[in-house]
């Protein structure tokens, strides 16, 4: 009876100490005090061995009940203290959602690059492969192989940047077409985007600009197929059904040749690109039999397409690094 009363007093004291613990450190000290190896409860457990079996059974059950009561109280208090600590932490880290947000400025793709990618995507869906080549070109691939020999008057059409008598900054991406035909067998279906250079600078011309040229060589190509492809390109790029016309023109590397115009909202015809059937001399220079194969080619200025799509009247705006201008295309 004396031991049982002692256990009741121990339980009361332990529960009071647990309730008074204000943090987890203090609670752990209470746990050690009342359930540790040197606690009164542990001493009473050791004394069970000196009791007769019947008394040991009763007192052992009483000690177990007290230990379980204390442990349950410790667990509940620990949970309560942890929740209180978490609530305090959350309260101290509260975000004031009434504060105005701070916008993050992000970069974007340059409008010329956007237009170039848009055009190339159209042609890749049509089965074309994107091909690239050197910007520093030799005279042969830039002129000679394109049916423009040294004495040809068409060379006057190009204001060229020369490094020496045989090396220059390419004036078009047609050299990529020649290099591809030299190393590939028909059918050949490629588009060649890239920077080109001409000694010209004004509101509609730049010493450096971007061009996309296309080439299709096979046994049964036709001008009708070329027309259909380019009309589809223009309608998809400008997202409207356009009035399109093909005017006879002259390019030394195509025969027949044509320039393509579209009608704007004011009823004016605007030139957008050039095209034609590949000249037999060009096929022959690249090692392709012009009696067996035919081809068509076309070329367009990327900046020209961008100006028409976005209503820009000065090509130089693309390269003035004016962030106010460029942000409009983000």
UniProtKB/Swiss-Prot annotation:
GO biological process, one term: phenylalanyl-tRNA aminoacylation
UniProt: Mg(2+) binding residues: 255
SUPFAM superfamilies recorded: Class II aaRS and biotin synthetases, tRNA-binding arm
Entry's cofactor comment: Binds 2 magnesium ions per tetramer.
Enzyme Commission number: 6.1.1.20
GO CC annotation terms, alphabetical: cytoplasm
The protein's required cofactors: Mg(2+)
GO molecular function annotations of the record: ATP binding; magnesium ion binding; phenylalanine-tRNA ligase activity; tRNA binding
UniProt keyword ATP-binding present: yes
Catalytic reaction annotation: tRNA(Phe) + L-phenylalanine + ATP = L-phenylalanyl-tRNA(Phe) + AMP + diphosphate + H(+)
Main location: cytoplasm
Top-rank taxon, per record: Bacteria
Record's subcellular location: Cytoplasm
Similarity comment text for this entry: Belongs to the class-II aminoacyl-tRNA synthetase family. Phe-tRNA synthetase alpha subunit type 1 subfamily.
Assembly and binders: Tetramer of two alpha and two beta subunits.
This protein's name: Phenylalanine--tRNA ligase alpha subunit
């Amino acid at each position: 009876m004396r031991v049982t009363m002692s256990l009741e007093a121990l339980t009361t004291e332990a529960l009071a100490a647990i309730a008074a613990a204000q943090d987890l450190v203090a609670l752990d000290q209470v746990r050690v005090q009342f359930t540790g190896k040197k606690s009164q409860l542990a001493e009473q457990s050791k004394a069970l061995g000196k009791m007769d079996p019947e008394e040991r059974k009763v007192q052992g059950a009483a000690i177990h009940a007290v230990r379980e009561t204390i442990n349950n109280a410790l667990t509940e208090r620990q949970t309560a203290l942890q929740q209180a600590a978490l609530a305090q932490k959350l309260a101290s880290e509260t975000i004031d959602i009434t504060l105005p947000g701070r916008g993050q400025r992000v970069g974007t793709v340059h409008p010329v690059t956007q237009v170039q990618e848009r055009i190339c995507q159209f042609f890749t869906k049509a089965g074309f492969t994107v091909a690239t080549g050197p910007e520093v070109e030799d005279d042969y691939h830039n002129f000679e192989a394109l049916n423009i020999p040294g004495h040809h008057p068409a060379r006057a059409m190009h204001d060229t940047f020369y490094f020496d008598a045989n090396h220059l900054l390419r004036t078009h991406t047609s050299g990529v077409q020649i290099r591809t035909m030299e190393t590939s067998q028909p059918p050949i279906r490629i588009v060649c985007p890239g920077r080109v250079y001409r000694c010209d600078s004004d509101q509609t011309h730049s010493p450096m600009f971007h061009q996309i040229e296309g080439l299709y060589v096979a046994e049964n190509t036709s001008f009708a197929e070329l027309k259909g492809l380019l009309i589809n390109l223009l309608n998809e790029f400008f997202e409207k059904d356009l009035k399109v016309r093909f005017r006879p023109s002259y390019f030394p590397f195509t025969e027949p040749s044509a320039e393509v115009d579209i009608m704007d909202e004011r009823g004016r015809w605007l030139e957008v690109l050039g095209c034609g059937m590949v000249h037999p001399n060009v096929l022959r220079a690249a090692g392709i039999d012009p009696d067996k194969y035919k081809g068509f080619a076309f070329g367009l200025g990327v900046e020209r397409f961008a100006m028409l799509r976005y209503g820009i009247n000065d090509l130089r705006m693309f390269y003035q690094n004016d962030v106010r201008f460029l942000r409009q295309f983000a």
